[in-house]
Amino acid sequence: MNKTAIYPGTFDPITYGHLDIITRATKIFDSITIAISNNFTKKPIFNLKERIELTRKVTLHLKNVKKILGFNDLLANLAKKEKANILIRGVRTIFDFDYEIKLAAINKQIYPDLDSIFLLSSKEVSFISSSFVKEIAKYKGDIKPYLPKEAHSALLRKLNNDSIK
């Protein structure tokens, strides 16, 4: 049986934490679709096209990543449209788990064939979040340990351009 899964997120920017989950998921599933949310409530630094391109560059070496797309819909609706019945979710803390278990129940109610698989973040990256990285970068802190080089360069360029305007 071909196992296809969706890994959704905002990826603003993609971090080593995201890459940890994606890399490990490619060892479990035959095909991974990375779905990048166009969630304006999060006020992303990068636009959707930039986040898709950064994610593509960072995951090029992962052959099981078959598709990277943006979406502006309920996740369950996207999964149904993409004919995927597995959602991959990374969990760092008990607070993440509490949120994710509620989200999984709602998604299951909307799309009964959809199951959520939770992968615990590796301990080396379990504290990384895009929000923390952006905060560190805004105050000129070192963000290299948290981001793949493409995302690191892009974030520094973006912050420098924004401060010039």
Curated annotation (Swiss-Prot):
Protein family: Belongs to the bacterial CoaD family.
Catalysed transformations (reactions): (R)-4'-phosphopantetheine + ATP + H(+) = 3'-dephospho-CoA + diphosphate
EC number: 2.7.7.3
Name used for this protein in its record: Phosphopantetheine adenylyltransferase
Binding sites annotated in the UniProt record for ATP: T10, F11, H18, G90, V91, R92, E100, V125, S126, F127, I128, S129, S130, S131
Keyword tRNA-binding annotated: no
Pathway connected to this protein: Cofactor biosynthesis; coenzyme A biosynthesis; CoA from (R)-pantothenate: step 4/5
Oligomer and partners: Homohexamer.
Binding site for substrate: T10, K42, L75, R89
Gene that encodes it: coaD
Subcellular location field: Cytoplasm
GO MF terms held by the record: ATP binding; pantetheine-phosphate adenylyltransferase activity
InterPro entries for this protein: Cyt_trans-like, PPAT, Rossmann-like_a/b/a_fold
Annotated keywords: ATP-binding, Coenzyme A biosynthesis, Cytoplasm, Magnesium, Nucleotide-binding, Nucleotidyltransferase, Transferase
Highest taxon of the lineage: Bacteria
Sites marked Transition state stabilizer: H18
Enzyme class: transferase
Entry annotated with the keyword Zinc-finger: no
Role summary: Reversibly transfers an adenylyl group from ATP to 4'-phosphopantetheine, yielding dephospho-CoA (dPCoA) and pyrophosphate.
Gene Ontology cellular component list: cytoplasm
Cofactor: Mg(2+)
